[in-house]
Amino acid sequence: MSASRFIKCVTVGDGAVGKTCMLISYTSNTFPTDYVPTVFDNFSANVVVDGSTVNLGLWDTAGQEDYNRLRPLSYRGADVFLLAFSLISKASYENVSKKWIPELRHYAPGVPIILVGTKLDLRDDKQFFVDHPGAVPISTAQGEELRKLIGAAAYIECSSKTQQNIKAVFDAAIKVVLQPPKQKKKKKKAQKGCAIL
């Protein structure tokens, strides 16, 4: 029997968007109600997806600016990134293209990205928006638009609190590494027609 493939999966995104809760929810099937650490301890587990066993290594990062110099150290050897934003934070949504994509393209060019919208349970919670009048929900269509803009392999909305789509996020990350999307041929055609004499 062959050894399972190791996949390094790194979470990135603004502080307080729910990266650590997503990892805790996935690895323990529970939602942390009291203390949530800034960074989850690295975790690895054997996971079976579509009949293939992989050893999934999960790396958490801190989104706060204090960690800007340290964070890229965890990018080395990454097979896939989970780029998270909160579905109730327009700023975290905007920072995906303003801050995170430039950082990932600089330190880890070519590594596939799964775009993840977190806190799905709160987007439909009317009371949350009454209590937080400045909060602006991000729609599924806006998430899909952002996925296309940044060239992410997939876009998934999830809730760590209700566990909705949590497994789907990590399954998508594993699948994009095991079965990379085929490169589109459009680029080659465009390059052929761009000869300037």
Curated annotation (Swiss-Prot):
Keywords (A to Z) from UniProt: Cytoplasm, GTP-binding, Lipoprotein, Membrane, Methylation, Nucleotide-binding, Prenylation
Keyword Nucleotide-binding listed? The answer is: yes
Q: Name one GO molecular function term.
A: GDP binding
Q: Where are the transmembrane segments?
A: none
Query: Can you list the GO cellular component terms from the UniProt entry?
Result: cell projection; cytoplasmic vesicle; cytoskeleton; plasma membrane; site of polarized growth
Q: Where Cysteine methyl ester occurs, residue numbers?
A: 194
Q: Where is this motif: Effector region?
A: 35-43
Q: Where, by residue number, does GTP bind?
A: 13-20, 60-64, 118-121
Q: Where is the lipid attached (S-geranylgeranyl cysteine)?
A: 194
- Recorded superkingdom: Eukaryota
Q: Which residues form the propeptide?
A: 195-197
Q: Name one Pfam family in it.
A: Ras
Where found, per UniProt? Cytoplasm; Membrane
Q: What family is reported? A: Belongs to the small GTPase superfamily. Rho family.
Q: What does this protein do?
A: Inactive GDP-bound Rho GTPases reside in the cytosol, are found in a complex with Rho GDP-dissociation inhibitors (Rho GDIs), and are released from the GDI protein in order to translocate to membranes upon activation.
PANTHER family per record: RHO FAMILY GTPASE
Q: What is this protein called?
A: Rac-like GTP-binding protein 5
